[in-house]
UniProtKB/Swiss-Prot annotation:
Residues 1-26 form the signal peptide. It comes from Mus musculus. This is Pyrethroid hydrolase Ces2e. Glycosylated. Disulfide bonds join 95-123, 280-291. PANTHER family: CARBOXYLESTERASE.
Amino acid sequence: MPLYKLLGWLNAVACGVLLLVLHVQGQDSASPIRNTHTGQVRGSLVHVKDTDIAVHTFLGIPFAKPPVGPLRFAPPEAPEPWSGVRDGTSHPNMCLQNDNLMGSEDLKMMNLILPPISMSEDCLYLNIYVPAHAHEGSNLPVMVWIHGGALTVGMASMYDGSMLAATEDVVVVAIQYRLGVLGFFSTGDQHAKGNWGYLDQVAALRWVQQNIVHFGGNPDRVTIFGESAGGTSVSSHVVSPMSQGLFHGAIMESGVAVLPDLISSSSEMVHRIVANLSGCAAVNSETLMCCLRGKNEAEMLAINKVFKIIPGVVDGEFLPKHPQELMASKDFHPVPSIIGINNDEYGWILPTIMDPAQKIEEITRKTLPAVLKSTALKMMLPPECGDLLMEEYMGDTEDPETLQAQFREMKGDFMFVIPALQVAHFQRSHAPVYFYEFQHRPSFFKDFRPPYVKADHGDEIFLVFGYQFGNIKLPYTEEEEQLSRRIMKYWANFARHGNPNSEGLPYWPVMDHDEQYLQLDIQPSVGRALKARRLQFWTKTLPQKIQELKGSQERHKEL
């Protein structure tokens, strides 16, 4: 299959992975019924294909009112009660988004079949996966998954928690939240403070606190976990005063609250773009919001599709200050955390999706200065920093392949690695932090990706959810199966005890001043001081050089 044919499917992989299971008919527990604060819900008995493992699934449970009409661009409100027994056997609507990024024919070619899921603003639902033996009083650990997708795409039903729930005896909850403009648009004032998607996540966590006991979960043992923008969400909840007490552990996979593209102190740029695209010639925020609430779904979707990525904002409530300030001031209540990255975050999928016009494979020593100058501007750095980036990452090498590899490393460091290390350093003095670098290149990608790609963005998700046991006919090795089982065990141990270690697993040391971390590969091992030189460059050397540059420019102006 040519690489371009795989783009749609890999877009889905970047935000998550579809792990479908087979529904089976049966007696009694085949139609489990559970209570919630707003009514009863009926689920399904599900067997993971080719195993005797059974789980109960409850799909499409509302945790808030539909965010439509006057509730568009407003905080979520508690769901309305219902009478009778609600059907929880079909997937909920996914939130309004550019569904072209979710893949189509390419999924079928890989024997991956997306369920036919409709799209609607009425999308604030969650899915629950519970071991079939669980009942009220089982007090199982709860793992709440927040999907990624640049805060613009994704859905809960791409992630099937059945294998993780059944093999590790945990309750898995996958939640949805408003995306794109509908989820994160802000006017910067009281008329639309923004972060609606984050507020949806808070509402879902409150629902879990109130109701998960009826599904066999322990509300006092909740771990939130997510990847990419989902990891950013998790990290943002750690520092948000609105989320305190709603969870007790946090797992951040390739995403933290200070990712440069997913947090902004100002909403001005997005505000201006939306105002122009909408045709709402508003003289003030109040009239703009009135106009936007009057748009239909198709009109809002057209605006949404302009944004491949959209940032959360400092809104004064969910995020009283920039996350970096909140961490530096210790103005938060940290919980034990697993934080990690993959060793090739900008290897292939992200440049393919986010910046297809930039042909990394065309970089040479001759073209590099212009490329780095442009890249520095995109990073919100002075263009003169291009020379510093060249010196740090490329040195004097002339070899194009080496230059291209170093460029990809530089982008991955800036976007994911350095922010993750910064957050780990902030948090480790207040609560245990376990850091990892995922290093395994999945074998089933060997025919679809360039050979230089290692562990790309999103690759670990397959293993976290036990991909090889789902209804997926992809080749995998025995070693990969063992690695998947180890990762699920680490994650579930952490959810259960706040510590990933247990007998039979390679030891994972806490990240302290020795800077130890786990190298997650077929043969896991302990590393030390991950990217110490690069961390020094991005957090000390580069800021100092920028200050010197500004000082020089100021003196030049005075002359």
